[in-house]
């Protein structure tokens, strides 16, 4: 599969999903039910921060294997704060993880890009679903996260940014 890696055409190794799961989940609805009346009069301000990290997992070869497959845990962390007229509507924190392996060996930089660009793209639809269901279950309209450009986020990390992609959503229909 060809792709443009930060302006350079290259090959990205194929990732294999070994598992995915919610590692940490927190939702606070501190000012209910009065906040529901406030939202009907004034749209909430929603701030979203996203962070991606990866870690190598220690794996021992099974019997008969000469070397174990390299496994990596990729964490997609999303923090959301919704405020209406300076009153917190809700706070949401989610760490959603996936365990990945690469189908072939690759140089370290290419592996890093696969883990911090491709892998979070695989996890993101599940993160979006969890957040939409959670906000709806808390009595708010489902919050549908906008698509995230993980390649641009990775490029900003290389440029010395803190690695967080911050979005502001001020639409009244979102939550």
UniProtKB/Swiss-Prot annotation:
It comes from the Bacteria. It is found in: Cytoplasm. SUPFAM superfamilies: SecB-like. GO terms for cellular component: cytoplasm. Keywords: Chaperone, Cytoplasm, Protein transport, Translocation, Transport. One of the proteins required for the normal export of preproteins out of the cell cytoplasm. It is a molecular chaperone that binds to a subset of precursor proteins, maintaining them in a translocation-competent state. It also specifically binds to its receptor SecA. HAMAP family: SecB (MF_00821). Belongs to the SecB family. Homotetramer, a dimer of dimers. One homotetramer interacts with 1 SecA dimer. This is Protein-export protein SecB. It comes from Anaplasma marginale (strain Florida).
